[in-house]
Amino acid sequence: MDWEVKIETKLKDGILDPQGKAVKTGLKSLGYDNVESVYVGKYLEIVLEDINQKNKAAKMVEEMCNKLLANPVIEDYSYQLKKMEG
């Protein structure tokens, strides 16, 4: 069974976001004065193959996030796990 995984990471509350600040400044300089805040994160899509149980796939995704895809000290992550058809 194959699984489609969609992962989003973002900085934890209270962590400075220099990329978000730069994007906000850029948008304001382009005339988008109504932009109050911008937060930059990451979005990843991964396909896992040959895993028969959803809980095993979820455990693998959590391990990947904690070991490489997110920095658990400064980032939060969330994911969606969906069984692929076919």
Outline where the language-model segments fall.
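Long, contiguous binding/interaction regions
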Residues: 1-41, 49-86
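Positively charged, solvent-exposed patches that mediate nucleic-acid binding
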Residues: 45
